Amino acid sequence: MLISPSALPTAEQVAITAAGLQTWGYVVKQSPNVLKNPRTIQDRYDDLIGGLHDTSVKALFCVRGGFASADVMDLLSIDTLRQYPKWLIGYSDITACHAAWHVAGIPSIHSSMSAIWDDLEQPCVEATQRLLAGDKPDYHFAPHPQNICGKVQGTLIGGNMSVLTGAFFSHFDPSLFDPNERFILLAEDIGMTANDLHRFLTMADHIGLLKRVNGIIFGELTDFIMCPEDLSGSSHGGSFVDGQDIAARLLECKGYHIPVAFNCPIGHGKQNYPLLLGETVYLDITPTDVHLYY
């Protein structure tokens, strides 16, 4: 079923998504309020609940992200999710929904949405089609000069850092699920400032999330904004070069000496390789390769 628990999609986005899924062999339903304008938080919640309760629906495909899916998650009972487990597909603001799915113990798919069929490079399109058909990803990504090598495994969680920050301390905070669980953290964003990145890593440290992270996959930091007047790096040992430099040095100064892969093709660019959240993933980082597999 097509839903949009975040921002209101256009009719074109809904049509493109429906047609694309149909060409892949799926029967597509459209939730009643997906194009309702204006609509309310309750309308978005009703679409989500309707999809969960509909026994003919096997997956909830989010048409777009945007803002405020957390409002819907605030209304959603984790017990309801557990009672009606369904696949969830989306990314960006849908990270709040992924967090709730994880707390409920249900895997979900971090993937592009309507952009799959009009704004994504073909290898990513094909990878998404394979994952929806049941093939688990096995990727080799290019190395980055600031990568920290190592081989680790853990349950993959995360997504958009700004949205994930908003989930901290909520009933859908992914760190609430199974205190003994170890994670691989996925982290990407668009339009993020250096201060935002510092805030995310600091809060993830304070709530104890980073202490349970075995490794980090940083996706693209699209349109990243340096803040030289506030966070120049002069108080952290010298000027920061970019977002990757900020993250690497903050993790080091906080005592997290774990494998980290930077600038993986996941996020808001033309490349957004899909991933399966809530499942054990293996991360093998060497000087020449980043191998991510299940």
Predicted regions and their residues:
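ATP/NTP phosphate-donor binding region
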Residues: 1-56
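Conserved anion/nucleotide-ligand pocket segment
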Residues: 107-172
